């Protein structure tokens, strides 16, 4: 059975960018191109991949009948974003169906984060491996969940990570099903910079055209690989 609805999760590249006047995103454009109804949307600006993986699974478990009708679009973001649940209900109003609220820290977020990572560096942290594992593990984890439940999906990188140089990281990366991962060698972020499709260079996010063109390529990839079913 082909999907009738779409579910979208990721970072700000899959949300409206109101302050830049961008009232669309690649997921919404793909939704129109595929002729699907909205099933669920949990993308959140500034959030990372742990939240994407966890909230997608929770949504599916709570909405089993709707999940069976969905095509899933997952934007895997930068591995520099480390998610954690909070006790203060942060931005809970945006996701009323979720009991947990989430925040994210990164190596350069603030003084406290920088100090924490300085401490980790004294323990010989390999920051590149940490970032890469954060992204790749979420992608592999979710792809296995989708395949287990026979949910059709497509993934892509919204923001790129550093090149892989470690053999263990490469082995995990090789577990990603590239048939369902659009342009794994690049990202939506790289694409808009290369093609001058940025809404605001002060904080680069896609312009309307940047969202539309990416969605069109996603649609072509989905159709060429018969990804509507699994």
Predicted regions, residues:
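Serine-esterase "nucleophile elbow" of acetyl-processing enzymes
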Residues: 1-57, 62, 213
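Alpha-helical cap/lid subdomain in secreted, periplasmic
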Residues: 57-230
């Amino acid at each position: 059975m082909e999907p009738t609805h779409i579910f979208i999760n990721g970072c700000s590249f899959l949300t409206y960018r109101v302050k830049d006047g961008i009232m669309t995103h690649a997921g919404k454009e793909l939704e129109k191109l595929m002729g699907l109804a909205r099933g669920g949307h949990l993308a959140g600006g500034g959030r990372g991949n742990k939240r994407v993986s966890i909230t997608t699974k929770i949504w599916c478990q709570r909405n089993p009948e709707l999940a069976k009708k969905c095509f899933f679009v997952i934007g895997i973001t930068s591995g520099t974003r480390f998610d954690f649940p909070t006790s203060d209900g942060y931005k809970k109003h945006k996701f009323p169906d979720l009991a947990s609220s989430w925040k994210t820290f990164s190596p350069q977020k603030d003084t406290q984060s920088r100090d924490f990572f300085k401490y980790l560096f004294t323990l010989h942290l390999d920051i590149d491996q940490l970032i890469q594992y954060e992204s790749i593990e979420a992608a592999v984890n979710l792809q296995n969940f989708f395949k287990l439940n026979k949910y059709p999906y497509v993934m892509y990188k919204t923001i790129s990570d550093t090149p892989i140089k470690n053999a263990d990281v490469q082995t995990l990366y090789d577990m990603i099903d590239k048939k369902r991962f659009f342009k794994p060698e690049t990202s939506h972020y790289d694409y808009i910079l290369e093609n001058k499709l940025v809404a605001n260079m002060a904080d680069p996010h896609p312009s309307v055209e940047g969202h539309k063109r990416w969605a069109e390529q996603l649609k072509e990839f989905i159709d060429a690989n018969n990804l509507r079913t699994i």
